[in-house]
UniProtKB/Swiss-Prot annotation:
Any Pfam family the entry gives: His_Phos_1
Name by which UniProt lists this protein: Mannitol-1-phosphatase
Transmembrane segments: none
Keywords: Hydrolase
EC number: 3.1.3.22
Family per similarity comment: Belongs to the phosphoglycerate mutase family.
Source organism of the structure: Eimeria tenella (Coccidian parasite)
Active site: H82 (tele-phosphohistidine intermediate), E166 (proton donor/acceptor)
UniProt cross-references to SUPFAM superfamilies, sorted A to Z: Phosphoglycerate mutase-like (SSF53254)
Keyword Ligase: no
Length: 309
């Protein structure tokens, strides 16, 4: 079956049509909540409570509570989202924990990766951020974004950490946003920054086309997670980053914190930003994580809470 060819005009019209269906999407979200298992609702509320976030289940949005404090880590973090891929080029897809051909760096993405390496080298030369350790998501778009810096700078250790993988969109993964039903509550994820909505079914892996099978460890499918669950997973990932850095770099760093450059993704990066107190808020104080709120491609971003400007 031939793929739909989207002209810019047709795509713009489709997105406007989707936006006009927010009331129907909200009705679908209300059904999603009614059908959710009670233990899932409790778990999502517990995640928010543990992270000192205010969760409005009715609209799926989150805010910082007054008592929120950034996650305390024994490391300093510089986060680099991967370079551009076909998957985040219009007509874009939900690009989560997938690693197929369309999820790899484009030529522009490769150029961005090289530019990110140059930028990080300049930051090191200026003593703004000198990495002791480089950690990457196992998805190749992140690994290949790290590669130019790794190749030119052999001194910092480089490791792949599976826990840094992107948010898993389940059955939405690698589906074109424009081709989901216009009343699908999936659209609330990016239209209204809904941190609760998630796909019902998993992503079924096509092993023959998967580009990095070694980290799958035999998995045949990847369950969906919502942004709250991604936050919780990235919290655990950051704690592990601290443990790895202490083990590998602690003796050479002395009294100072090890500095870690993390190569990752848009939603995972947004989660890390929220956890470290750099979450982006709208006019009502709700946290955003997709669309206009995401990190730019291949741009080193220092995320050190309470750091002096």
């Amino acid at each position: 079956m031939a793929e739909t060819e989207w002209t810019p005009e047709a795509l713009s019209g489709r997105y406007e049509e989707i936006k006009s269906c927010i009331p129907q999407q909200l009705e679908a979200y209300a059904r999603f909540l009614r059908e959710a298992a009670p233990e899932d609702l409790r778990r999502w509320q517990q995640i928010a409570q543990d992270l000192k976030l205010e969760l409005n289940l009715e609209n799926g949005r989150i805010k910082y509570k007054k008592e929120f404090k950034p996650l305390e880590l024994p490391v300093d973090i510089c986060y680099i989202r991967h370079g551009k891929t076909q998957g985040n080029t219009e007509p874009r897809v939900f690009q989560g924990q997938v690693d197929y051909a369309n999820n790899q760096l484009t030529q522009q993405g490769q150029q961005q990766a090289a530019a990110a390496a140059t930028k990080l080298e300049a930051m090191a030369a200026a003593k703004e951020f000198i990495p002791d350790l480089l950690l990457s998501s196992p998805l190749l778009r992140a690994v290949h974004t790290a590669q130019p810096f790794v190749d030119a700078n052999p001194k910092p250790l480089f490791r792949v950490l599976p826990e840094l993988a992107e948010m898993a969109f389940g059955e939405w993964d690698n589906r074109k946003v424009a081709e989901l039903e216009k009343d699908d509550p999936a659209h609330l994820f990016y239209l209204q920054q809904n941190a609760v909505i998630k796909a019902k079914g998993p992503h079924r892996i096509c092993c023959q086309l998967w580009q990095s099978p070694e980290w799958l460890e035999g998995k045949k499918e990847l369950p969906a997670e919502n942004f709250l669950e991604c936050l919780d997973r990235q919290r655990k990932a950051l704690i592990k980053v601290g443990e790895i850095a202490k083990e590998l770099c602690g003796p050479s760093c002395g009294e100072r914190k090890p500095r870690v450059a993390v190569y990752g993704h848009s939603m995972a990066g947004a989660a890390v930003s929220v956890l470290l107190g750099f979450g982006k808020e709208d006019q009502l104080g709700f946290l955003g994580f997709d669309g206009n709120y995401i990190m730019p491609n291949a741009t080193p971003t220092i995320l050190i809470p309470n750091a002096k400007p």
